[in-house]
């Protein structure tokens, strides 16, 4: 049995499994997951091991609220292209790296971090990831990924990422993924905490780029941004969106009424 099979291919009952999620999430109710941490750290840091196994070890460590996992995420975010596993997982829609989206998923859940006293480091790992939002692809996760407390801690970093992204769009820089939609997703997340700010961020993006996909994602702000800003934003979307967007906006406005 390989080291990977022992650590992530065997459930906590000692049975082989081909579903790594059985192990990743089984750890939340199984203190014995701590016994696997030293081996996972060694696997993650071993250049002789396959990149996919090193990456999944990092995902496991971050999911389990381990210091080594969060520190690895921060290192990866500091120099994305040099990460050993960069481009090992590629998004089908845009044919770009999707490892940071998976790492963001791993960092988002803070239950074990609270238990292990690593919450501050978890937030720093989340900060490092959010700072990549204008340059790396996060699938469609950033709108709903982080809890409100984490979002508050990251608010300045989110604003800076959106600022950089808008400047990039204005300059006509070409990325291989849908940056405007990703920025709108961030604005949508912010709108739960600060409706006016979230709407302002989204409007800055839409004034530069407003594809049907971006507008469709922007609809979430209509119900998330409490107060008149959400309704005003919905009325704006009615003037620029297609039939699908308009129907979704009217539904959202109806719920908010």
Regions found by a protein language model. Name each.
Residues 75-79, 208, 240:
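A short linear boundary/processing microfeature
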Residues 187, 200-209, 213-221, 232-236:
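Extended alpha-solenoid helical-repeat scaffolds
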């Amino acid at each position: 049995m390989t080291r990977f099979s022992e650590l992530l291919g065997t459930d906590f009952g000692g049975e082989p499994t081909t579903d790594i999620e059985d192990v990743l999430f089984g750890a939340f109710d199984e203190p014995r997951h701590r016994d696997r941490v030293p081996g996972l750290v060694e696997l993650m840091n071993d250049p002789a091991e396959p990149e996919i196994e090193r990456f999944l070890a990092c995902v496991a460590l971050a999911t389990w609220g381990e210091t080594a996992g969060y520190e690895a995420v921060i290192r990866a975010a500091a120099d994305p292209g040099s990460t050993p596993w960069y481009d090992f997982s590629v998004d089908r829609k845009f044919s770009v790296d999707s490892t940071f989206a998976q790492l963001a998923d791993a960092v988002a859940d803070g239950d074990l971090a609270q238990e292990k006293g690593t919450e501050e480091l978890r937030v720093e790992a989340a900060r490092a990831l959010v700072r990549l939002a204008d340059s790396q692809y996060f699938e469609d996760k950033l709108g709903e990924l982080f809890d409100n407390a984490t979002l508050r801690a990251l608010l300045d970093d989110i604003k800076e990422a959106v600022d950089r992204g808008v400047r990039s769009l204005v300059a006509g820089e070409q990325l291989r993924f849908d940056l405007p939609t990703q920025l709108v997703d961030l604005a949508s997340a912010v709108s739960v905490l600060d409706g006016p700010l979230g709407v302002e961020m989204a409007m800055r993006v839409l004034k530069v780029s407003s594809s049907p996909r971006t507008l469709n994602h922007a609809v979430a702000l209509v119900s998330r941004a409490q107060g008149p800003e959400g309704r005003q934003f919905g009325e704006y979307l009615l003037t620029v969106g297609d039939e699908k967007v308009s129907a979704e906006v009217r539904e959202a406005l109806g719920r908010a009424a």
